[in-house]
Amino acid sequence: MSMSANTMIFMILGASIVMAIACLMDMNALLDRFHNYILPHLRGEDRVCHCNCGRHHIHYVIPYDGDQSVVDASENYFVTDNVTKQEIDLMLGLLLGFCISWFLVWMDGVLHCAVRAWRAGRRYDGSWTWLPKLCSLRELGRRPHRPFEEPTGNMVHVKQKLYHNGHPSPRHL
């Protein structure tokens, strides 16, 4: 599956929106809410797993207080055996960025469908012919090669300088 230019642009746009949210808002408050509210509901009280897979079985998770328990920093407490709070914050931020990116890609598709449906009703109006070319990144670099016509109906021939291989020179169009 090849990614189109629109997909890449919207993924970068989504990542920049996440960075803007992180810079403008207190991202630590959002992540602390995740750690203090959502994770305890998933783990349950006293680190009891309340998963639906074994509803009648209660699995107690006993934390291992080994060498890693010496770390006392609130920014670096250990959530599981190998994953720290900072790593979960990183994964949550990346997940949030991808969700926003894919939402923007979906909105781009919805916009294109809406524009196509709207233009289908206005087929004979030529005032919106620039919109699909603006939305299509492939067409931005290409120039339309239409023959120029004079008002009398005679064709005007435009001479272009060509490269040695026959392609038109972009400097002399």
UniProtKB/Swiss-Prot annotation:
The modification Phosphoserine is found at residue 169. It is a multi-pass membrane protein. GO terms for cellular component: cerebellar climbing fiber to Purkinje cell synapse; parallel fiber to Purkinje cell synapse; postsynaptic density membrane; synaptic membrane; TMEM240-body. The chain crosses the membrane at residues 5-25, 90-110. It comes from the Eukaryota. It holds the Pfam family TMEM240. Keywords: Cell membrane, Membrane, Phosphoprotein, Synapse, Transmembrane, Transmembrane helix. InterPro entries: TMEM240. It is found in: Synapse; Cell membrane. This is Transmembrane protein 240. It comes from Mus musculus. The gene is Tmem240.
